[in-house]
Amino acid sequence: NAADEGTQSPYGPKFPPIGFKACLQAAKAHPNYTKPVPEGAGRGVAVGFWFNVGMQSSAEVNINENGSVMIIEGSPDIGGSRASMCLMAAETLGIDYDDVRAQVGDTESTGFCNVTGGSRTTFATGMAVTQACEAVIADCKRRAAMTWGLDEDQVEWEDGQAVPGPGVNADVKPLSLAELARKAGKTGG
């Protein structure tokens, strides 16, 4: 009775590709599942599902002059969600986790966030953090292009730095997040 692509969900839309049946079949075919079990022992599989409602979350990502990052989020920390936000920001920006901090703002200092709950917060607020980091990267690429006299599409982002794209003059040296942050006052604030 496993749902798959096209199954009508109880809350409205039809499911997109899920892969659940393929996962069960792969587990069933695995040698650990097909080998005999000792007498008196059993083998079973348990599966659970919880959909995420998403809803609205807000996050702000600020880059300090030394390249460190401060996340301001509106969802109170439950079960280490601030650490999760820092991990997502570090991965998206391509910087060290130790260079990222997260702070929960009050209702006057951050955008609106719906209910804080274990099945929603890390996903929805994490998406807000990731999108904010992607906006930072786009801005950094724009600033690097301006610094180098290139078009924005000639700049890429790799490992926490703006790098010249393929075919760009080899004399153009990468600019780290910290270098771009230090130059922000001279490249449009």
Segments the model singles out, each with a brief description of its role:
Residues 1-93, 105-189:
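Cofactor-centric catalytic regions
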Residues 98-104:
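Generic long, charged, amphipathic alpha-helical segments
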